[in-house]
């Protein structure tokens, strides 16, 4: 057969960062910032490669590109600290997408299996529409920005829209979240560039 088998997912990295290598112990500095960054990159690579291993080659290119982009952001959020608002926001978006996908698949199965069913009464159908509309409007409702602090630049609201989970965040916390989000984005870009370089030489 010409079809290539999907490679198995990579081995998960060591969950205990204090024993990653012997460099930190030899230096006597304990688990420093450099080791923490290395552990985060290891976790990012693990989650991203595991997500890539689940993508089928027969998937259309446009859908595959969208899946890879979502996998990159989800793996970045899983590798980050769960205390970060941006990582929780990205993981929440991923869970919501999975829920919508499962609901659509369940609806398709129900339509296929139901051969003949009595039509719902107008009252029950109207109630279903009201509930669905309420859920949609509640989910789409934006979080209002907090009161502007003294010295806060006018473009802070634009930054709140760019950083996941930044809506409604006060300015000092927003700056901290932005810095951590940018560090993770930089690590993600380095990982993907390394993968491109690796496969370009094969």
Swiss-Prot record:
Residues 1-33 are annotated as: Disordered. It comes from the Eukaryota. Interacts with ILI1. Keywords: Brassinosteroid signaling pathway, Growth regulation, Transcription, Transcription regulation. Residues 136-185 form the bHLH domain. Transmembrane segments: none annotated. It comes from Oryza sativa subsp. indica (Rice). Atypical and probable non DNA-binding bHLH transcription factor that acts as a negative regulator of cell elongation and plant development. Binds the transcription factor ILI1 and forms a heterodimer of antagonistic bHLH transcription factors that function downstream of BZR1 to mediate brassinosteroid regulation of cell elongation and lamina inclination. The gene is IBH1. Belongs to the bHLH protein family. One of its GO terms (biological process) is unidimensional cell growth. Residues 1-16 have a biased composition (Pro residues). This is Transcription factor IBH1.
């Amino acid at each position: 057969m010409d079809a290539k088998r999907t490679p198995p997912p990579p081995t998960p990295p060591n969950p205990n960062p204090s024993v990653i290598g012997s460099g930190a112990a030899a230096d006597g500095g304990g688990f420093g910032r450099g080791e923490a960054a290395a552990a985060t990159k290891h976790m990012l690579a693990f989650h991203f490669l595991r997500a890539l291993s689940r993508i089928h080659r027969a998937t259309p290119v446009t859908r595959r590109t969208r899946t890879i982009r979502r996998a990159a952001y989800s793996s970045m959020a899983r590798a980050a600290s769960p205390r970060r608002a941006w990582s929780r926001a990205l993981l929440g978006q991923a869970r919501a997408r999975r829920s919508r996908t499962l609901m659509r698949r369940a609806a398709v199965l129900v339509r296929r299996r139901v051969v003949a069913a009595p039509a719902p009464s107008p009252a029950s159908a109207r109630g279903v529409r009201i509930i669905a509309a309420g859920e949609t409007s509640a989910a789409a409702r934006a979080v209002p920005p907090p009161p502007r602090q003294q010295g806060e630049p006018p473009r802070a609201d634009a930054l709140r829209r760019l950083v996941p989970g930044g809506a409604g965040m006060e300015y000092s916390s927003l700056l901290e979240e932005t810095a951590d989000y940018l560090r993770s984005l930089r690590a993600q870009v380095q990982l993907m560039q390394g993968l491109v370089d690796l496969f370009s030489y094969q």
